[in-house]
UniProtKB/Swiss-Prot annotation:
<comment type="pathway">
    <text>Carbohydrate biosynthesis; D-ribose 5-phosphate biosynthesis.</text>
</comment>
<dbReference type="InterPro" id="IPR020568">
    <property type="entry name" value="Ribosomal_Su5_D2-typ_SF"/>
</dbReference>
<feature type="region of interest" description="Formaldehyde-activating enzyme">
    <location>
        <begin position="1"/>
        <end position="161"/>
    </location>
</feature>
<protein>
    <recommendedName>
        <fullName>Bifunctional enzyme Fae/Hps</fullName>
        <ecNumber>4.2.1.147</ecNumber>
        <ecNumber>4.1.2.43</ecNumber>
    </recommendedName>
</protein>
<dbReference type="GO" id="GO:0016051">
    <property type="term" value="P:carbohydrate biosynthetic process"/>
</dbReference>
<dbReference type="InterPro" id="IPR037075">
    <property type="entry name" value="HCHO-activating_enzyme_sf"/>
</dbReference>
<dbReference type="InterPro" id="IPR013785">
    <property type="entry name" value="Aldolase_TIM"/>
</dbReference>
<dbReference type="GO" id="GO:0016836">
    <property type="term" value="F:hydro-lyase activity"/>
</dbReference>
<dbReference type="GO" id="GO:0004590">
    <property type="term" value="F:orotidine-5'-phosphate decarboxylase activity"/>
</dbReference>
<feature type="binding site">
    <location>
        <position position="19"/>
    </location>
    <ligand>
        <name>substrate</name>
    </ligand>
</feature>
<feature type="binding site">
    <location>
        <position position="83"/>
    </location>
    <ligand>
        <name>substrate</name>
    </ligand>
</feature>
<feature type="region of interest" description="3-hexulose-6-phosphate synthase">
    <location>
        <begin position="162"/>
        <end position="393"/>
    </location>
</feature>
<comment type="similarity">
    <text>In the C-terminal section; belongs to the HPS/KGPDC family. HPS subfamily.</text>
</comment>
<comment type="similarity">
    <text>In the N-terminal section; belongs to the formaldehyde-activating enzyme family.</text>
</comment>
<keyword id="KW-0456">Lyase</keyword>
<dbReference type="InterPro" id="IPR020868">
    <property type="entry name" value="Fae/Hps"/>
</dbReference>
<keyword id="KW-0119">Carbohydrate metabolism</keyword>
Amino acid sequence: MYQIGEALVGDGAELAHIDLIIGEKSGPVGIAFANGLSQLSAGHTPLLAVIRPNLLTKPATLIIPKVTLKNQTQVTEMFGPVQAAIAKGIADCIEEGTFKEYDIEDLVILASVYLAPEAKDYNKIYRYNYGAIKLALNRALEGFPPEKTILYEKDRGAHAVMGFKVQRLWDAPYLQVAMDLVDMGKVAKVLKEVPDNDHVIIEAGTPLIKRFGLSVISEIRKLRPNAFIIADMKILDTGNLESRMAADASADAVVISGLAPASTIEKAIEETKKTGIYSIIDMLNVPNPVELIASLKIKPDIVELHRAIDCETSCHAWGDIVAIKKAAGGKLLVATAGGVRVEVVKEALASGADILVVGRAITASKDIRHATEEFLEQLHKDEIDQFRVMTDF
């Protein structure tokens, strides 16, 4: 056996986080156990889990401090409530039948334990670590999480300690608010009034980036830290360099012009895959978007069918979205832009659009919040994480 478990329980300075490995004494876990006891490190000296002095728990468990213990207070907390919680939690697992299929004499456990230097409340330290060791152990023996849970959670979950969520586009349709503005005061007003919603995307428009540079992405991020932010750079040359610049500026996606040479487009897309951001091809003035997508060796994440502001009242609609998705041969989102108003949302969605790009209909509205909500209502999508506790399953 070589099983791995992890659990986070509690909050504040006393928060408990345990990484755990359980396996046979005769295997690699047993070797690691022996090495841990014999190869000591200052501030990270492992200790055995004991229920009380002279009484080990079984399976024998080695507690390894993750954070360097620098003073007597931390040492006392580790040798007191943490050690007691780990030992009692494992002993209770015996009573509850967690090990009924195993011989506890054959097994050992390595438990890497987080203890913040600021932790003070012994009661919380004990209770959080007690819950965490039991949860981590049961997860290890159950093989949690299954692949299905990982794939389901990877784009909807948020790390409980990190403090912000990195948005991904997995639950279309979305509303993209295009800020083709040149006044940071106006940008701040729009960002303040557009409601927080899992299905809202923020676009730093081309004029905004030309006026303030890519640093504007960071300014937007300060006001909307959890937002999915697009840098509409309309890349025409040096595709890899400009894609990297967008990623370095903390953009979640970058726009590449479909009029760029194929090699530039492909280099830009390749760079987005290296940096973990989305690639968007803007098909403004591209005569045959289907042909372009089919010709690319590496496909984008999103295609934007874009009618220019100067012709959005006279140009045709967005084209054959189904054919574009088919040409991509895989997962592809299609955004529709230019002249998108509330009354055409149903038409765009029915034609296969995944993202509705709206600019002045929101940013120039007298009531920005109300205008945004009108579009969101047409999406018929609930907020994903409105009532969600990110440590729950």
